[in-house]
A protein has these predicted regions:
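Structured C-terminal helix/loop/strand segments within mature extracytoplasmic catalytic/sensor domains
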Residues: 33-130
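Mid-domain, small-residue-enriched loop/turn segments at the edges of structured enzyme/sensor domains
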Residues: 1-39
């Protein structure tokens, strides 16, 4: 509750509340949380936030770094998948993002990342080498 993550209702399942619990979060809230984590401005020790950041590191393109996390809520209809994170530029600029999409079948899982990379590339934020 102290971070204000979504509706802050984690219910009783502490190991997967973000997938099957009562927790609800908007894309705007996801982006805000990702930005706060990227800038270590959440109400947690900065060293802990740095450890989480390191766990979310995906790849580097040039000097830009991509950090992200995917997820798939399968207990709702329609099922929802997301790819949320941020790009860190060498000058320290942070661009947080989230992609939420309806999930249907197997290929949708890989499409989340590719769609996000395509948009970040087109916006000139993270050039993806194909």
């Amino acid at each position: 509750k102290r971070v204000g993550f979504g509706n802050t209702d984690i219910g009783h399942q502490v190991d997967n509340f973000w997938l099957v619990g009562p927790l609800k979060i908007t894309p705007e809230q996801e982006v805000k949380f990702a930005y706060q984590l990227a800038t270590k401005s959440l109400p947690f020790d900065a060293a802990v936030q740095q450890q989480v950041k390191e766990m979310l590191y995906i790849e580097r393109r040039g000097d830009a770094k991509l950090y992200a996390k995917s997820g798939w809520a399968s207990d709702v209809s329609p099922q929802v998948g997301w790819y949320t994170g941020w790009v860190e530029q060498p000058n320290g600029k942070i661009t947080a993002f989230t992609l939420n999409m309806e999930m249907k079948e197997g290929d949708d899982a890989t499409e989340r990342k590719q769609l996000t990379l395509d948009v970040l590339d087109k916006l000139g934020i993270f050039f993806y080498l194909r």
